[in-house]
Amino acid sequence: MDPLQEANGTFALNLLKILGEDSSKNVFLSPMSISSALAMVFMGAKGTTASQMAQALALDKCSGNGGGDVHQGFQSLLTEVNKTGTQYLLRTANRLFGDKTCDLLASFKDSCLKFYEAELEELDFQGATEESRQHINTWVAKKTEDKIKEVLSPGTVNSDTSLVLVNAIYFKGNWEKQFNKEHTREMPFKVSKNEEKPVQMMFKKSTFKMTYIGEIFTKILLLPYVSSELNMIIMLPDEHVELSTVEKEVTYEKFIEWTRLDKMDEEEVEVFLPKFKLEENYNMNDALYKLGMTDAFGGRADFSGMSSKQGLFLSKVVHKAFVEVNEEGTEAAAATAGMMTVRCMRFTPRFCADHPFLFFIHHVKTNGILFCGRFSSP
C-alpha cells in the first residue's frame, strides 16, 4: 500500500473518531483536504513541531519524514483528484493567511505554489482585523461557488492572530443510477432506541455492489457516481448494533479490506437512503491537539522553515465542508416529491438506512477518502 495513501486514510479515520465523539451529532469533513492543507504548513515546520505534525498526520510512516517525497506525493494526488474533465465538480479553497509582519520566506511561498497550488496571502490582522476576516470569507465563497460562506465567524480572528489556515471544500456529483423523485416519501428515521424523526427517504431498486461484514454486523453498500471515478460507501450496522461499535473497529486497513470490489457481490438491492444536507464547520485546533500536534498552536512552535520571525505560531485551523445528498446525486436543486408506497418483494435484499450510518466518498483511482461523515439525525 502506498505510504501516503495509508497515512491519509489513517488520519481520516482518526479525525472521524475525534470529531464524532458526541454520537448524537452529524459529522462531515474532507480529511484529504485537511491533510493537504496541513502538509503545506508542515513544509515550514522544524524540530519538535515538525515531528508532532508528522505524527498527527500519520506521515511518520512516509520515508524521509518531512522530505520532498511527501509533498511530491500530495502534488500528484491533488492533481489527480482536482483534474479537469471529470464528471464531478470539486472546489477546494486552501490558503494560509499570515499577518503582514510575518515576513514569509520566498522559498516557502514557492514550495506552496509548486506542490499545493496554494498562494499565501499577507493581511493586516493587527490593524484591520474585521476587514481581514471579511476578506477571507469573500475569497472562500468565491472559490466554492458561494456554497460556503462565513468560514470565519465574527470574533474568530483578533489583533494577535498571526497565521490562519483556511480550508473549505464543496463537491457536486451525480449518481450513476439516479433515484426517482416520485419514489421519495416521508419515513421515520430511528435516531436512537427511543427517538424517531421524520426524513425524506429516497428509494431505488437496482443492482449495486453490497457486502456484509459479520464481525461488526454491518452491511456495506457502494453507490457509484457517474463515470465511476468516485463512489459513496455506506456502512450501516444492523438495527441492534450501535454505530459507535463500528466506529471503534474501523481502521484504514480494515476499510480497504471491507470495501474491496472483488469481495463484494453485485446484486439487486432495494435501497432506502435519506435525503440530507450537512454543512459542518470545525475549528480543528482541538482535534489536532488531541492527535499530538501541541506545539504548533503556541509559543513553542518552530516555523523557521516558513519565516525568520521568532514566535510565529498557528492561530487557527478552520475547516468547512458542505454536502447535499438527493435523488440526482450530491448537491442539486431541491424538488418536491410525491408520496408513494413502495411494494416490497420479500426476496430482494434491502438496504434501509433508517438509522445512523457512516458514509465515505471514495476516489477510486487513488484509493483516497475525499470525504467522510456520519448521519445520526435529520
UniProtKB/Swiss-Prot annotation:
* Keyword terms, alphabetized: Acetylation, Cytoplasm, Phosphoprotein, Protease inhibitor, Serine protease inhibitor
Kindly list the positions at which Phosphoserine occurs in this protein: 153
Q: Superkingdom of this entry's organism?
A: Eukaryota
- What is the tissue localization of expression for this protein? Expressed in the inner ear hair cells, keratinocytes of hair follicles and epidermis in abdominal skin.
| Subunit and interaction comment | Forms a complex with the monomeric form of beta-tryptase.
PANTHER family, A to Z: SERINE PROTEASE INHIBITOR, SERPIN, SERPIN B6
The name on file for this protein is Serpin B6
